[in-house]
From Swiss-Prot:
Residues 1-79 are annotated as: Disordered. This is Maintenance of carboxysome distribution protein B. Residues 51-63 have a biased composition (Basic and acidic residues). It comes from the Bacteria. Transmembrane segments: none annotated. GO terms for cellular component: carboxysome. The keyword Protease does not apply. A type 1 McdB protein. Homodimerizes; may exist in higher order oligomers in solution. Forms a complex with McdA:DNA. Homohexamerizes, interacts with shell components of the carboxysome. The keyword Chaperone does not apply. It is found in: Carboxysome. Residues 122-156 form a coiled coil. McdA and McdB together mediate carboxysome (Cb) spacing, size, ultrastructure and probably inheritance in the cell, together they prevent Cb aggregation. McdA is an ATPase that forms dynamic gradients on the nucleoid in response to adapter protein McdB, which associates with carboxysomes. The interplay between McdA gradients on the nucleoid and McdB-bound carboxysomes result in the equal spacing of Cbs along the cell length. Stimulates the ATPase activity of McdA, causing McdA to be released from DNA. Undergoes liquid-liquid phase separation. Incorrect positioning (aggregation) of carboxysomes results in reduced CO(2) fixation by encapsulated ribulose-1,5-bisphosphate carboxylase (RuBisCO, cbbL/cbbS), which leads to slower growth. The gene is mcdB.
Amino acid sequence: MSNNALDRLINKQKPKVPPRNDVVSESVSNDIKTQGQQELNTSLPPSDTKATPEEMPTSHESETSLSQDQKPKLSPDTFETVRNTIRIESEVDESLRQLCHEERITKETWLEAAYLYLCEKPEELAQVIQLAQERLSQRKAIADYKRAKTMQERFL
């Protein structure tokens, strides 16, 4: 029976499908590109003008924002992102998620902004690095404990 089913699977013919024609004429694609670029230009404020207070987002951290001269310039042509997966303590994750939800930002943009802010403040950056090193050693100790516990359960 299994040989018969295997033979049927091997000999099964795939349906014939006509090849797709995905080629778009060059003039249409150029029109779409220029239209998209025009929409981007109209939606983004000019980089040499500064935003008025009405345009600035209201936030609890407005006093600690980056200076206008030090703000990174984001342009659609050079903007690249990298996908990362990070492990965060569940309580910290929940509190950060709540903060980001209230402020209507993402964890990624919060992390970027915090890093850029700390780069301007070397003393605070040193404190954060010290705290991060302490948390890393705690995590390593917990991982060692869990590993030893698992090994003990396997051998006993």
